[in-house]
């Protein structure tokens, strides 16, 4: 089996470069393409059928969550790993409901990206430790 073929999707070029740089450290992983918005991500998944998509939540044209829903249709064997600046349990739960293999925060990317990629490839879920708890609605108002 060859290297794991990865599509990296983030609207900020600096983040894409960082993600690609981290992935390049592992000879068993290969970035096959980069995309900067949700529409391009879906198109590239349909065309390239990557093994794994590292997908930002906050994307232009089509949100990461909506792109993931469409990727599940056009490239059903592609695993999806969300990478987000948003440490939200709600967004994380929605990502997992869609079928994501994991959800990591950009804050933790240096530490968590490669372990999360390896977990996704092995069909294991991976979540960042810094996902914030949801606000409690039953707290007394001041």
Region roles according to the model:
Residues 37-40, 63-66:
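Acidic catalytic/metal-coordinating carboxylates
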Residues 2-15, 19-23:
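Conserved acidic segment of CheY-like receiver
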Residues 10, 56, 84:
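Active-site residues of response regulator receiver
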Residues 90-97, 102-142:
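Short, flexible helix-to-coil linker/hinge segments that flank and couple to helix-turn-helix
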Residues 28-36, 44:
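Short hydrophobic/Thr-rich beta-strand motif most characteristic of the beta2 strand and flanking loop
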Residues 15, 60, 84, 88:
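The feature encodes the CheY-like receiver
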Residues 46-48, 70-78, 98:
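Conserved phosphotransfer cores of two-component systems
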Residues 48-54, 59:
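Active-site beta3 strand of CheY-like receiver
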């Amino acid at each position: 089996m060859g290297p794991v073929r990865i599509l990296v999707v983030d609207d900020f070029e600096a983040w894409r470069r960082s993600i690609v740089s981290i992935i390049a450290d592992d000879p068993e992983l290969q970035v096959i393409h980069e995309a900067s918005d949700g529409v391009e991500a879906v198109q590239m998944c349909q065309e390239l059928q990557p093994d794994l998509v590292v997908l930002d939540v906050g994307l232009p044209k089509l949100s990461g969550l909506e792109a993931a829903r469409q990727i599940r249709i056009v490239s059903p064997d592609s695993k999806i790993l969300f990478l987000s600046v948003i440490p939200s349990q709600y967004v994380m739960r929605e990502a997992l409901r869609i079928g994501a293999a994991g959800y990591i925060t950009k804050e933790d990317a240096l530490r968590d990206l490669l372990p999360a990629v390896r977990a996704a490839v092995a069909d294991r879920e991976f979540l960042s430790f810094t996902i914030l708890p949801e606000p409690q609605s039953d707290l007394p108002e001041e």
